[in-house]
């Protein structure tokens, strides 16, 4: 019987593609040899199955590769046909667009020619209108010049009349202003006299008021000095009271500390007696 090699008893780690034939001895149907032969037969069947599966996979891959090549050939033919069809279509589109562009160019050229003719006619008409307008402006200028000369002559006469009237009015106003200034001067003189009298009266009143204020300030300074002395006396009394209270508190604190020390000493002596 032919056997396949195996490596580990825990599982199949690797199978060799080559077979090793050997003929084991069969000492008996029962025992370790029979079990080993049974295991060997099972591995031999597994090897055969693996070889068959490998062969089937190769056949399937070969068939799949053949189908893939046929598909690629069909795709290449389809692509070539599509490329040819698109090339023909591009040529047709190019010829169509060239015809359309040529027609459009001819149409634009015709429109440009018509527009140029219309523009030329409009420019000629505009030139004629400008010429007519220049003639009208020249005639209007001559007419306006004569009118302006006539108006200037009449305006000079009116200006002279206005200047004479203004001079007459100016002389009248100068006389009126002279009379008014004389009256204002007299009024200012009377007002100045009244102001001087009022100033003297106010100065005398201010002097009297200043004397009264000076007397009031002197009395107030005396009252302030008296108040300041009273306040200083009260402050000194408060300072003395505070010092006395501080000394009393210090004495009380010393007495409290001495009492605490005496109590602590007595407590320590009592503890010593208890411990003894």
UniProtKB/Swiss-Prot annotation:
UniProt region (Nonhelical region), positions on chain: 1-31
Alphabetic keyword roster: Coiled coil, Cytoplasm, Cytoskeleton, Microtubule
Keyword Aminoacyl-tRNA synthetase: no
Single GO MF annotation: structural constituent of cytoskeleton
Localization: Cytoplasm, Cytoskeleton
Example of a GO cellular component annotation carried by this entry: cytoplasm
Pfam families: SF-assemblin
Chain segments annotated as coiled-coil in the UniProt record: 67-145
Main location: cytoplasm
Region of interest called Disordered, as start-end residue ranges on this chain: 1-37
Region named Rod: 32-276
Comment text on domains: Consists of a small non-helical N-terminal domain and a rod domain with a 29 residue repeat pattern based on four heptads followed by a skip residue. This alpha-helical protein is characterized by the ability to form a special segmented coiled coil and to assemble into striated fibers of 2 nm protofilaments.
Family recorded in the similarity comment: Belongs to the SF-assemblin family.
Protein purpose: Major component of the striated microtubule-associated fibers (SMAFs; system-I-fibers).
Protein name, entry field: SF-assemblin
Lineage: Eukaryota, Viridiplantae, Chlorophyta, core chlorophytes, Chlorophyceae
């Amino acid at each position: 019987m032919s056997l396949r090699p195996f490596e580990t008893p825990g599982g199949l780690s690797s199978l060799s593609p080559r077979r090793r034939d050997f003929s084991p001895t069969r000492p008996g149907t029962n025992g370790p040899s029979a079990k080993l032969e049974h295991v060997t037969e099972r591995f031999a069947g597994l090897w055969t199955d693996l070889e068959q599966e490998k062969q089937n996979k190769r056949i399937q891959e070969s068939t799949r590769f053949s189908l893939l090549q046929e598909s690629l050939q069909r795709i290449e033919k389809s692509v070539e046909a599509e490329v040819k069809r698109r090339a023909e279509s591009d040529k047709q589109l190019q010829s169509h667009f060239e015809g359309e562009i040529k027609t459009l160019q001819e149409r634009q050229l015709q429109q440009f020619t018509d527009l140029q003719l219309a523009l030329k006619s409009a420019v000629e008409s505009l030139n004629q209108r400008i010429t007519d307008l220049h003639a009208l402006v020249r005639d209007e200028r001559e007419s306006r010049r004569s009118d302006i000369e006539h108006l200037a002559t009449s305006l000079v006469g009116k200006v002279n009349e206005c200047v004479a009237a203004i001079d007459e009015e100016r002389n009248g106003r100068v006389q009126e202003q002279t009379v008014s200034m004389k009256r204002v001067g007299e009024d200012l003189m009377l007002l100045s006299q009244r102001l001087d009298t009022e100033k003297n009266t106010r100065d005398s009143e201010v002097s009297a008021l200043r004397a009264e204020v000076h007397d009031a300030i002197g009395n107030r300074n005396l009252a302030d000095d008296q108040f300041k002395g009273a306040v200083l006396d009260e402050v000194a009394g408060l300072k003395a009271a505070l010092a006395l209270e501080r000394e009393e508190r210090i004495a009380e604190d010393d007495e409290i500390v001495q009492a605490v020390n005496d109590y602590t000493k007595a407590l320590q002596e009592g503890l010593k007696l208890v411990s003894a």
